[in-house]
Swiss-Prot record:
Residues where FMN binds: 65-67, 95, 124, 185, 215, 259-261, 280-281
GO biological process: isoprenoid biosynthetic process
Binding residues for Mg(2+): 155
Enzyme Commission numbers on file: 5.3.3.2
Reactions that this protein is recorded to catalyse: isopentenyl diphosphate = dimethylallyl diphosphate
Name this polypeptide is given: Isopentenyl-diphosphate delta-isomerase
Family: Belongs to the IPP isomerase type 2 family.
Source organism (scientific name): Lacticaseibacillus paracasei (strain ATCC 334 / BCRC 17002 / CCUG 31169 / CIP 107868 / KCTC 3260 / NRRL B-441)
NCBIfam families the UniProt entry points to: IPP_isom_2
Classification of source organism: Bacteria, Bacillati, Bacillota, Bacilli, Lactobacillales
Cofactor(s) in the UniProt record: FMN; NADPH; Mg(2+)
Subcellular location: Cytoplasm
Family annotation (Pfam families): FMN_dh
Amino acid sequence: MTQSQQSHRKDEHVFLAEKYFQSVAHAGFDQVRLLHRALPETTMAAVDLKPDLPFNWQWPIYINAMTGGSPQTGKLNAQLGQLAQALGVAIASGSQSVALRDPQLVPTFATLRDHDPNGFILANVGAGHHATAAEAAVAMLKANALEIHLNAAQEVVMPEGDRDFMWQANIKSIIATSQVPIVVKEVGNGFIREDLQSLQQLGVQFVDVGGRGGTNFATIENARRSGHDFAYLQDWGQTTVESLLEARGLGLTMLATGGVRSPLDVVKALRLGAHAVGMSGMVLHHLIQTGYEATLAYFQNFLHQLRQLYALLGVTNWQELQEAPIVLSADLEHYRQARGLPGI
């Protein structure tokens, strides 16, 4: 694939992600009910939102992987880096595979670090890459951590996608040689418990569930196919909420992404065991539709509302939130029981 073809594909992904963006997502958060406390017995000043992570993050949200690899997406990455710095949140790069193949595309990713010189940045490679490529991706961004993305469904539907999914040896090798923490993530189809246990056996500690309900790369890649013949995979995978239930009790440090649309969604994900929550489609949508300044104001208010919701629930930190009363819908409770998953 030529550089122009690679760049065009990256631009297509952004266009289609925005085209298929849904303001009301179907990630399962509507099936989770946090119960109101009439006597919260707390103060907003007492709320500590700092996540229980060894990354020194100040907020329990981060901007998740999106883009890079073309002049247009490079401009978006510059805005995203600037936004992350202004908000004081971590940010993950889009997949750097194209820049590893073509060094001329490196600036479209490195602009994240240029605009967020002191922030926490996660590099990003696919699980098909070896340890040397992972090291190069980290060096490209002077990254603080590395995401390894799992995207089998996307690759199957992508006309030019990979067809080799023998990934576990690569993951194990990257973990063994990496100088930075590793986060293994799905890109929108979620996890089941068996795969999470396999990751544990490889030495993985940090997992982003990347559940169904947000940006759907199977749908995006199907739109790029002439016959659009994979439409039936639109609902493939486990939702973000189902994936969090699958992870309970395993001892992994979970991050949650996929279909997060509100501060309440964030708090629900945290209550289900996520230590931090990522957003990508929401951020991209606001940047494209409203511009940088309005997006910054929106997410500043978003962060403030997290503090308000903690106080409303009568909790002051993540540990206390784990004890907040919660009810699952009948369908979600049936899923939990059918899968033999721990209670909440």
